């Protein structure tokens, strides 16, 4: 199918590449070594990946709907009450889709449309009702969210075109569906 080969598969591959770059940028955000440049770079990588996701929303049929991937990646609105509750037990597995995906990462990385200040990650958050949340916990949460996001982006890609062995292995390791029965 020309649409799959020329549009859908390349778009999802590029989305995977962009989310990998975001994952790499988030990996530089450790509480002790974080700099404003690291935060700004992660924000730029987020915007690039998010833009690619927006392009892919033109074809949310097939695997995106068959396997409920879209709500997992792009739930809106972010459930801040559930997110705050999660930070009360940050070692728990994140099962609530309303605190995963792009909007969760956006909340961690940005305030009022601008990259957050590095000081907020070195101390406590300044967002209303989140001032009791440590920036270090937010960074750990962001790492869990990006890993989950990456797996689901890979799931989209390999569901349409399972030729990338590395990404297919990641999807299988995460026990995600990529083929209909």
Named regions from a protein language model:
Residues 1-181:
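Mature extracytoplasmic or organellar-lumen-exposed domains after removal of signal/transit peptides
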